[in-house]
Each structure stands twice: as structure tokens, then as C-alpha cells.
Amino acid sequence: MALACCLLAVIARPASAASVQLRETGSTLLLPLFNLWIPDYLASNPNVTITTAATGSGAGIEAAISGTAQIGASDAYMSDEQAEQNTQIVNIPLAIAAQTVNYNLPRNGGTPLKLDGPAIAGIYSGKIREWDAEPIKALNPGVTLPHHEIILIRRADASGDTFVFTQFLDFSTPSWDDKIGYGTSVAWPSVPGEKTAVGNAGMLKAVAETPYSIGYIGISFADEAAKAHLGTAMIKNQSGRFLLPTPETMSAAASELDSRTPPDERLSLAFAPGDNSYPLINYEYAVVSTRQPDPAVAKALRDFLLWANSPLGGNTPKYLNAVHFVPLPDFIRASSEQQIQKIE
């Protein structure tokens, strides 16, 4: 009788929910935010496992398309060609980020250099070779600049940071638009002495270890850039003002363009108009397939993204301030929620 009772107790005990695994891969700029989100989310959702990988935005988009990851994290939205060929894939903004232009100038002092699109394009096309070249001097009157070769550093991987950086150059500099354009990968001009790096961590390391270098780095690495004593350039916007990325200048830039966001949410925020608009900002995307092969995976993916998008969940200052992102406007968050609900 006792044995029968024991067996009955075992049979009557409710089974624990099956574990569901989600895989995130892609943007190195967005990765620090996922690394803040995931432990807190999993603490309340122990039956879900989420893995992350820093592979670059281009790889993240491809992983979402191929189905090798449920979340392709990206600073770039899909191209028109990708969107036309993969109608099951949606681009879901999660936050607003920025890119910084950082440099390693020994004995430069604490005053940020001022740069504009044509000067940066000149550096990355090889037309401006020294730090004291006239186009840079003209933007920085009274600043002593070294007569030393500029060592430019760019991304080697398919990068959302490259996408936003080259969009800014494309929109602000006609000669760049005519010859190079923008994308997660572009046909970079060959410049003597140039270096390449993989990921934002790689860019930060390369600029920090290379005196007289310049590079572009995602703002989620701003604290590390400051610890490495890198300078951050003030960038000239459409109104002719030189600005650093702050919550105010990033939000101002987003407010100039976010009303143009289409239903599929693919929109560039680079080089926005407005006196107080920092010109190198972007939506941070989760690129996701709406057609998941397993209903349990689809539900876990929906639930996580709804939490990440919520002002009561992941879209709060606790998380966003730590990586120097700004939250989505309410109407963009509502549009993102509509896209998330399509996942099945």
C-alpha cells in the first residue's frame, strides 16, 4: 500500500515545462545590452536558455534568414534585395544607438577635435594623410595638430557600425556617395598604412594600441574608450554645429526622422536635420523570422522580445543608460510590438 501511494505521488506531480533554447548572434554594438538583459530575464524565466555571439551585424542578418539563430542582432536593417527575397523576416527596432569617431593622438590634451563628413571621408579615401592637413586645421583653429601620418582603422567584418558610418559619409559627402556608397561592407579605397579590426572590441583595441590612429566605434563601448584615453571627435551636423553623442543630441536626431518610420521599420537615422541632432545614430534591430518551426520557440521568442521592448522590462534606463542608448519613442515601440506579434 505504501509503495502504491509513493507511485501515485510521483505520477500526480506536475511535469516541469520543457526547456526552450534561443540563439542570438550578430551586432557587437548591441551585444552589451543583450548581456545585461539576459541574466535578468532568465531569472524570471528559468525554462528558457538564450545564448549570444558577437559575429557582426551582417552575419546576424544572415543567421536570421538561414534559421541558424532566432535573433539576428543588427545595427543595420535588411537591404531592399534581402527584404524582397525574405518576406518572412522582420526588422524590429529595440533601442537607439550611436557611433563615435575615436582617435589616439598623444599629448593632444582634453579638447575634442572637430571633424565633418568631408574630412572623415578624405581620411578614409586616402586624400587626407596627415593630422595637420589643411581640412582638419580649418575645422580646429588654435589647436596644435601633429605633422604625422593618420593611420585609419576600419572594420574587416560585415558590420552595422560600418553601415551607419558609411551612411553618414554618403549623406554628408557627395564624392563618397558617387564612388563608395554605404553598406555593412563596402569597397574601401586602399590607403597605405591602414589597419582592419573585427568587432567593436577589436576596433577599440586597435585604436588604443596605435598612436595617431582613427576609428569608428559603437557607443556601447564609450566607457572602455574613455578608460583607454581615446579622444572622441565632435561631428558636424546638417546645421553646421559640432556635437558629441549625448542622450539629448541622440534623442533630438531621432525626433527629426522617426515619424518617417515605415511599417517595416527599415529607416536610416543618420545625418538627421536639426540644430541639436548628433549625425551618427541608428535603430538597433532584432532581425527575426516570423515563421518559427516550433510553437514553443515562437512563444519564447515573442515573450522575450516583448519584454525587451517594454518600458516595464528591457526598455528602461536601468539597461539603456549603462550602454549609452536611448529608448524608442512610444509609437515606434508600439510598431515594434505589432511586428513581434507576427512571430508564430
Cite the ranges covered by each PLM segment.
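Bacterial N-terminal signal peptides
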Residues: 1-10
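Sec/Tat signal peptide C-region and signal peptidase I cleavage site
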Residues: 11-17
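Flexible loop/hinge segments at secondary-structure junctions
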Residues: 17-344
